[in-house]
């Protein structure tokens, strides 16, 4: 026999939780819209500067630069972009699984790894990788500043310049749409010419003052833009994942309330029937 009082308390508790998840869903929806607006405003710049760099390199294929040179791989650096807050479904764990797979592959080839961790979830998850971690940052917020983000990344770039790290990747969640976001790994260094540049082979450029100076001025902007774009995409993925998770929690709580209400009504009806039976039996005994 179900205890009516306990069922009523459970329904009240679930309704309180439902009101909290409802508020969080609305907040996440607002933040998701803002993050998508930020993503849409930064994406054209990243695409343009990537295209420009690609054009320049394709036209100067023999140009030598440390960031273009392929090395024998002894150590790979990963810039890991996660969230600061939870309640985002499997967003972070899927990303970490992908990175662990890459790290294990490198270990099999006797290749070391170094990590720059962005977001408290990555810092917490990889806390036992002390020897691999070279820098961390958390609390970047929903509208991060590139000046703050680039500081930990510069430590990894210095290790690349010192030949300690031979290749750098950034791993984050790629935002596709509100319901879809996938772990994505982009190569930061060394820079490679994309095959799409083949259509620019007949273009000729005049450089002022010269190609080398122009390339040196564009290069840091390209790296900053790549990192910032990856982080903004991860933020959009986070807000979308949280909104979907809260909506799912709302739907589940609604179904649970309906089930408990049905059990409550049946238990109440059973109690009423029992009480009526006892009253009738008692009245029969009187007569």
Curated annotation (Swiss-Prot):
Protein name: ATP synthase gamma chain
Domain of life: Bacteria
This protein's encoding gene: atpG
Cellular compartments annotated: Cell membrane
NCBIfam families assigned to the protein according to its UniProt record, in alphabetical order: ATPsyn_F1gamma
Topological category with respect to the lipid bilayer: Peripheral membrane protein
Subunit structure: F-type ATPases have 2 components, CF(1) - the catalytic core - and CF(0) - the membrane proton channel. CF(1) has five subunits: alpha(3), beta(3), gamma(1), delta(1), epsilon(1). CF(0) has three main subunits: a, b and c.
Listed GO biological process terms: proton motive force-driven plasma membrane ATP synthesis
Any single Gene Ontology cellular-component annotation: plasma membrane
Recorded GO MF terms: ATP binding; proton-transporting ATP synthase activity, rotational mechanism
HAMAP family, alphabetized: ATP_synth_gamma_bact
């Amino acid at each position: 026999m179900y205890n009516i009082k306990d069922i009523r308390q459970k329904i009240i508790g679930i309704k309180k939780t439902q009101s909290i998840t409802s508020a969080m869903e609305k907040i996440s929806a607002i933040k998701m819209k803002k993050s998508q607006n930020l993503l849409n405003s930064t994406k054209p710049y990243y695409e343009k500067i990537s295209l420009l760099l690609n054009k320049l390199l394709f036209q100067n294929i023999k140009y030598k630069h440390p960031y273009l040179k392929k090395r024998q791989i002894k150590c790979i650096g990963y810039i890991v972009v996660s969230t600061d807050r939870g309640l985002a479904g499997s967003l972070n764990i899927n990303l970490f699984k992908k990175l662990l797979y890459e790290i294990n592959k490198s270990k099999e080839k006797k290749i070391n790894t170094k990590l720059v961790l962005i977001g408290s979830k990555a810092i917490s998850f990889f806390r036992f990788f002390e020897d691999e971690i070279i820098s961390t940052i958390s609390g970047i917020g929903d509208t991060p500043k590139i000046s703050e983000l680039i500081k930990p990344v510069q430590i990894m770039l210095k290790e690349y310049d010192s030949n300690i790290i031979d290749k750098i990747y950034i791993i984050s969640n790629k935002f596709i749409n509100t319901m879809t976001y996938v772990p994505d790994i982009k190569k930061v260094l060394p820079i490679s010419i994309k095959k799409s540049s083949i259509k620019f082979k007949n273009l000729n450029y005049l450089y002022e003052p010269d190609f080398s100076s122009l390339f040196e001025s564009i290069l840091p902007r390209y790296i900053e833009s790549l990192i910032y774009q990856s982080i903004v995409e991860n933020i959009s993925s986070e807000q979308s994942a949280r909104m979907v998770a809260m909506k799912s929690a709302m739907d589940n709580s609604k179904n649970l309330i309906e089930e408990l209400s049905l059990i409550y009504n049946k238990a109440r009806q059973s109690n009423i029937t029992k009480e009526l039976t006892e009253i009738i039996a008692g009245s029969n005994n009187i007569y």
